[in-house]
Structure formats: C-alpha cells, structure tokens
C-alpha cells in the first residue's frame, strides 16, 4: 500500500515548479513581439498584414518541428533536449534585439520557434515521468497556467522596458531571463531514475501511482509515429486541442493590438488592461483545470466524464468573445474577453494532460509532438487570418466569429472522436511486427 501523500517527500513538485518557470520564460519570449508591435509598426512602416506575418513567423518553425522535436525528445530525453533548447531561447531573443528591419526580426522569430519547439512536449513528458495519474492535472496546470501568467507579468515588464528604454530592451530582458533559466535547468532537472535528491519512498509513490515508464519506444520513434497517426483517440485529442489553440493564439498575439486599435489605448494602457483576462485565466487554469479536476477524480467521479465536462464547458465559455464585438466600452470589452479566456484556460491543462494519459510506453513525446504540431498550426493561422480580416474590414468582429466556429469543431472532436481517456494499447499483431522490423533495421 502506498503511503498517504502527506508523508511523501515533495521533490516532484520542485520539478513541477521548474517546468512552470520554463514555460513562463518561453512564453514571455513569445509575447514580447505583441507588446512591441505598435513601436515596430511605426518604426518600420509595417502594414497589418506584415505585422500578422511577424506574429506568425515563430509558429512556422515551431509548428513544423513539433513532430520531429517529439521524436528527438523520445530518443535523447528531456534533460538533454531541455538544456540546449533553453540556451537557444536566449540566443534568439538577443538576435531579435539587434535586428534592423522586417527580415531580421522575421528570421530571429523563426529561430526562436526552432529553439522552443521541444519545450512543451518536454514538459508533458517530464510530467508523465514525475507525477502519478492522480496528480497529473495539477502538475500539468502548473506549467500550462504559466503560459497565461506570462501575460500578467510579462506584458507589463516588457511594456515598461519598451516605453522607457525602447523596443530593443524588451527583447534584451527576455534574453537575460532565458539564459538564467538555462542555468537553473542545467543544475536541477534529472529524470526520476537518475535524480539523487529523489528518495526511494517518493520514487515508489510516483511509480505505484501510474507514472509513465521511462524508456524509448519499441522499434524506434519513426515506427511509433506511424502507429499513433492511425489511432482515432490521438486525432480526437489533436483536433480538440488545436481548436482551443486558435483562440488562445489569437488573444496571445492580437489582444494588445485590439485594445490599441479598437479601444484607442496607448501601449501602457493596453498592457494594464491586457493583464486582467490573463490573470483570471491563470487562476482558472491552475484551480479549475488542475486542482478541481484532480479533486473530483480522487472523490471517485468517472475520470473521462470529469475531464470531458471541463473541456466542453470551458470551450463553450470561450464563445463569450462575441460579446466584445458589439461594444467600445473598455470595461465591457475586457469583461467579455475575461470570461472567454477564463473558460478556455480551464480546458487547457485538461487537454494537455491527456497527452501523457493516453500515451503508450515511449510515445509521450511523439503524441505531444503531433498534438502541438497541429495546435501550433493554429499559431500560424490565427494571427495571419486575423491580420488579413482586420486589414480588410477594419474590425475584429469577423476574426472573433472565425474563432467561435473553430471552437465548436473542437467541442465535437472531444465529445465524439476522443472516446474514453485511457492509454492507447501498445502495438500488437501487424503493428508489433512493423515495429520489430523497424528495430532490426
């Protein structure tokens, strides 16, 4: 019998916080461009369409490298990939700070996408290793809520630097933060089996609770990728999570611009107002998508019903963005956007945690790569489509309508396609033979 959690050491939660800090830093790396956008637009005479392309530049490489990054992650492990990825975040932000125009900024953002591609799958994989299933929503919510919280502290921090020192300093600050995290990660992170600070009691507790086994996929990662791409459960999760991603990335990239253009705020005003919905989103992510979900499952409620209920309810609340269309009152606009982001944030860690909950041995990074690849295609689509819609119509109404339609598609996928939330069976029969053949080559 596993001892009660109150008697178990808490090394795993130190790792959880470390992962959260990493996501916090790499999302500040991303949002600095949206805060600097008004100054960049003025200095380089950028059109809304060009600005949309700059917003999406990061996601071209980030998305395209999600699946390869997941394969590399499953092959070389969280520790090595996480270390060098964090170092390259700093390099990319520094290059952005010294760029002299559209081309240089675009190239630096593409490099940032390359550097950060393995980051989220690495957090998902590490969480699977370090936490039993009964703590998976809370542990996932730590790093997932950090993505939202980055807007709470990152937007004002970067805005202050940009307004007082110039836009280049906004990127310089994020370069320093990335370098500091690289050092911390190098010193602290190890997988459970090699962490000398992890006690046997806690290790046994993690393993007995259903943590994802360490190790590589049978037959190699390429064969596992083909097997998982034929699985309905993987596609149900992928489509649903990507639908959430469209709205998330719309707000992540365009919220400051919406506040400046539609509500006629300056940079500091927009930064202040933008922190409000992201603050509520951070709390919703952590306490509803994390603690509440784990609590209900621990009380004996059906795991699939609990997780799907939060997914559907959260994405339905995301439709509240329509309320912002018909108002020019800043208070009402932010209220509607806050409701939408709060709902979406509650669904986010639930969807993200499903990656490790359905993964077969050695497949967490690969499923994470698949899910994050399609999710981040939305990171390309949302800012570009929004930029073109706003450029043509001079309004965000059409952009918000498109986001709502995408959310409805995601709800359908979660309800109908995903099925029960349980591990994908390890390959058998023909699939096992294919994997064995791949291993022998």
For each feature predicted by the language model, list its residue ranges.
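Central cavity-lining transmembrane alpha-helices of secondary-active solute carriers
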Residues: 56-71, 275-289
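Cytoplasmic helix-loop-helix junction between adjacent transmembrane helices
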Residues: 108-149
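Helix-breaking motifs and short loop linkers at transmembrane-helix boundaries and internal kinks
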Residues: 45, 77, 98-104, 115, ...
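A late C-terminal transmembrane helix in Major Facilitator Superfamily
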Residues: 356-393
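Structural signature of the two symmetry-related core transmembrane helices
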Residues: 80-94, 305-322
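Helix-loop-helix hairpin linking two adjacent transmembrane segments in secondary transporters
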Residues: 143-196
């Amino acid at each position: 019998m596993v001892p009660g959690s109150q008697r178990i050491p808490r090394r795993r939660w130190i790792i959880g916080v470390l992962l959260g800090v990493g996501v916090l830093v790499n999302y500040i790396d991303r949002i600095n461009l949206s805060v600097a956008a008004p100054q960049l637009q003025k200095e380089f005479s950028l059109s809304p369409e060009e600005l949309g392309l700059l917003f999406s530049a990061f996601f071209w490489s980030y998305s395209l490298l999600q699946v390869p990054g997941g394969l590399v992650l499953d092959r070389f492990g969280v520790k090595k990939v996480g270390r060098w990825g964090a170092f390259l975040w700093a390099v990319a932000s520094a290059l952005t700070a010294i760029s002299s125009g559209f081309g240089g900024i675009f190239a630096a953002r593409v490099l940032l996408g390359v550097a950060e591609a393995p980051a989220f799958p690495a957090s998902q994989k590490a969480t699977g290793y370090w936490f039993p299933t009964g703590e998976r929503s809370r542990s996932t919510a730590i790093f997932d809520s950090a993505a939202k919280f980055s807007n709470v502290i990152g937007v004002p921090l970067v805005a202050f630097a940009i307004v007082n020192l110039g836009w280049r300093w906004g990127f310089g600050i994020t370069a320093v933060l990335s370098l500091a995290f690289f050092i911390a990660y190098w010193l602290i992170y190890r997988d459970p089996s090699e962490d000398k600070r992890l006690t046997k009691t806690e290790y046994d507790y993690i393993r007995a609770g259903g943590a994802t086994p360490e190790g590589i996929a049978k037959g190699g990662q390429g064969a596992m990728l083909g097997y998982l791409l034929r699985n309905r459960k993987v596609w149900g999760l992928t489509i649903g999570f990507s639908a959430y991603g469209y709205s998330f990335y719309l707000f992540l990239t365009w919220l400051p611009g919406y506040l400046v253009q539609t509500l006629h705020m300056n940079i500091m005003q927009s930064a202040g107002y933008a922190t409000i919905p992201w603050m509520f989103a951070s709390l919703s992510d952590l306490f509803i998508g994390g603690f509440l979900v784990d609590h209900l499952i621990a009380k004996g409620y059906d795991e699939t019903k609990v997780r799907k209920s939060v997914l559907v309810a959260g994405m339905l609340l995301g439709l509240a963005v329509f309320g912002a269309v018909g108002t020019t009152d800043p208070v009402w606009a932010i209220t509607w956007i806050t409701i939408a982001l709060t709902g979406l944030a509650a669904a986010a860690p639930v969807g993200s945690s499903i990656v490790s909950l359905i993964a077969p041995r050695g497949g967490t990074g690969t499923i994470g790569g698949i899910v994050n690849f399609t999710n981040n295609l939305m990171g390309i689509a949302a800012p570009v489509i929004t930029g073109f819609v706003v450029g043509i119509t001079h309004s965000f109404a059409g952009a918000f309508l498109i986001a709502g339609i995408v959310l409805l598609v995601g709800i359908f996928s979660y309800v109908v396609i995903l099925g029960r939330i349980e591990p994908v069976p390890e390959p058998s029969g023909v699939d096992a033979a294919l994997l064995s053949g791949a291993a022998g080559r």
